[in-house]
């Protein structure tokens, strides 16, 4: 519980930032977790550690997936069928995620101190989502992880960890991550169990950061990604990411160009 004179800050982007040296790295019992956060400070700076957002976990009822599996005769393995089902959702989400950003973004500005160097924002300029754009909590643009198959997802993610560009798999900050095991490689045996969506800014008007109506809309949007006839390929995913970056930087008071 909070003292009566303290409140939870309702925005994703921080405000009232103190000098960086006054921000302490979280002290945890597990020293690996402490080392991980110290790495993030070195890579991204302390101010970016102050960003927050909603992680939306989504799982299809296993009984429903099993029923779909037995209603088809193309895929021999139940695990492969489940993986392909979740991969289709993930790929189509990356293709069309900009629509949700347009509807639910809520990080139009931040104080100048947040930026290393001069602010890229012009006076009185507002954008849809600083958090989801290149000035938010994102990986280096060269970090590319393939969603073509679960095998390629695992191998490309492990590549970036081995190269040192990521200190751990959890440093991969995609809008959607494949979940269900502590290590990505374990998914090859267990299969994808659920998806983690990381796109969403906090809704500053919602007590818990997201309204129930918004959560339900996102739920139906994710289901739509499964029911679309087509599955986005790498070019489609690339287009979706480019469009996300454009929409994130648009004036939130105007309609999107799309």
Regions found by a protein language model. Name each.
Residues 1, 13-15, 63, 74, ...:
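Extracytoplasmic glycan-interaction modules
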Residues 1-29:
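Active-site acidic/histidine clusters and adjacent loop/turn architecture
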Residues 7-18, 69-74, 234-241:
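Short, glycine/acidic-rich hinge or "gate" loops at secondary-structure transitions
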Residues 19-25, 68, 206-210:
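A short acidic (Asp/Glu
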Residues 24, 28-42, 46, 50, ...:
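Loop-rich catalytic cores of soluble enzymes, especially ATP-dependent carboxylate-amine ligases
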Residues 175-182, 187-258:
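Terminal accessory/anchoring regions of large secretory-pathway or extracellular enzymes
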């Amino acid at each position: 519980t909070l003292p009566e004179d303290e409140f939870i800050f309702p925005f994703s982007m921080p405000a009232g930032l103190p000098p960086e040296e006054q921000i302490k790295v979280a002290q945890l019992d597990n020293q690996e977790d402490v080392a991980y956060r110290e790495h993030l400070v070195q890579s991204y700076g302390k101010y970016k550690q102050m960003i927050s957002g909603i992680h939306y976990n989504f799982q299809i009822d296993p009984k429903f997936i099993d029923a779909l599996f037995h209603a088809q005769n193309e895929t021999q393995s139940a695990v492969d069928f489940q993986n392909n089902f979740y991969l289709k959702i993930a790929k189509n989400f990356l293709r069309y995620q900009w629509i949700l950003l347009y509807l639910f973004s809520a990080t139009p500005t931040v104080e100048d101190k947040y930026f290393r160097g001069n602010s890229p924002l012009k006076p009185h300029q507002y954008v849809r989502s600083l958090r989801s754009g290149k000035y938010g909590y994102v990986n280096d643009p060269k970090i590319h992880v393939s969603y073509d198959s679960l095998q390629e997802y695992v191998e490309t993610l492990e590549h970036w960890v081995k190269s040192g560009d990521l200190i751990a798999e959890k440093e991969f900050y995609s809008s959607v991550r494949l979940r269900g095991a502590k290590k990505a490689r374990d998914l090859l045996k267990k299969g994808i169990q659920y998806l983690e969506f990381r796109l969403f800014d906090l809704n500053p008007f919602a007590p818990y950061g997201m309204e129930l109506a918004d959560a339900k809309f996102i739920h139906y949007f994710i289901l739509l990604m499964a029911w679309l006839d087509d599955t986005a390929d790498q070019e489609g995913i690339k287009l979706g990411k480019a469009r996300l970056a454009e929409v994130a930087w648009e004036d939130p008071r105007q309609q999107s160009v799309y």
